[in-house]
A protein has these predicted regions:
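Glycan-recognition/cleft segments
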Residues: 93-102
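Terminal beta-strand-rich extracellular "head" domains
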Residues: 80-92
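Extracellular receptor-binding modules and their adjoining Ser/Thr/Gly/Asp/Asn-rich linkers
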Residues: 2-76, 102-133
């Protein structure tokens, strides 16, 4: 362990950090944004924020299929983590969102239709980044 000093039988290491919160932890409103897909569910979007909402296009998504689109975002680093979920705009439980890949400046997001029928809805995908170094 770098930066360690023996102290009896224990070690003091300044790399350890603890965060205690008595209120919500999250991003300020200035770090959040929203964007809407223009022409199809596979159309890429750009939103340079650490958290936000992506309103997908209302085009049909066949049963049991996945669509992929690219989110271009200058706040994404290759060492970051992206969390996604469906927040509104679609049949509850019908969609499974996921991050297919993450590179500096962009993420490929997938949306799977988990139903037995085609859906023509505009689900809203919420996302938040955990920034890595």
């Amino acid at each position: 362990m770098p930066n360690t000093q023996p102290v009896g039988v224990a070690f003091a290491d300044p790399e350890f950090t603890t965060c205690y919160a008595s209120q919500e932890i999250g991003y300020s409103s200035a770090a959040q944004g929203a964007v809407t897909q223009a022409t199809s569910k596979s159309t890429g979007v750009t939103l340079n924020k650490s958290a936000g909402k992506i309103t997908m296009n209302g085009a049909a998504l066949a049963a049991g299929t996945t669509v992929l689109f690219t989110l271009t975002n200058s706040t994404i680093s290759a060492n970051g983590v992206m969390i996604v979920n469906v927040g509104a705009g679609g049949t509850s439980g019908a969609y499974w969102p996921y991050v297919a890949s993450l590179t500096a400046g962009s993420a490929v997001i997938g949306l799977y239709n988990n139903t037995a029928g085609s859906l023509s809805e505009a689900p809203v995908i919420n996302f938040a980044l955990i920034h890595g170094q």
